[in-house]
Amino acid sequence: MRTNLTFCFVYLILFNFTFYTFLNLQILYQDEHLVAINKPNGLAVHKSKLVGNTNEFALQLLRDQIRKRVYPAHRLDRKTSGVMLFTLAEKVSSMLQKQFMERNVSKNYLAIVRGYTETHEVIDYPLTNYSGKVQEAITEYSRVASSELDLPYGKHETSRYSLISLTPKTGRTHQIRKHMNHIRHPIIGDRPHGCNKQNKLFKNRWEVNTMMLHASEIEFSHPITNKKMLLKADLPNEFKRTLKILSLNFTSA
């Protein structure tokens, strides 16, 4: 247990369940209308049938922490860490959600993926949602760093990895995860969209069992003041540790 963090992670193996216990959430920004947190990996934003058995949610924890009712302004996967916006009034939440719908919000992610990616690429590949509807989906990414380890993998004598910066142009469910798997550069630790062999390698060799996808930045207009806002979330320690393991050089701005 790491007590020096803003949240506490307890990992127990009991009947094949993983239990998380979170303490105070890291607040990145707060005023009378908005509050932004650096959401830990493994914490669902709110209760839904997709998150399975869990008793803790960011919505509930933040409400109890600041003693005010909060409303999520957008989605962020349970397995993804990083910037998550909430509002303190339902009306303000609707105003922010309108910015998302009109694509006036820019979100940036960092991910560690298998292989050497292109230097820059736009992935334009439609995705099918849960109801079977095919939707436009576009993700732009750039390679930040790459490395090669003297570690045999499959038919290859070495293992290659890339750190990439991604900007989704649309907001489909699991869009980044599905797009990276589609171009054969799956995100390390991603289940079910990743590479099972790589995930097993990282778990057994380095005890890395979390998904290497982090929402690092979000840029939007304040729904009340119209001021341009840029919020950044520092990388989780596990992400930093994995960068070090793979010799991927990265310095956040």
Q: Residue locations for each model-derived region?
A:
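RNA pseudouridine synthases
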Residues: 2-253
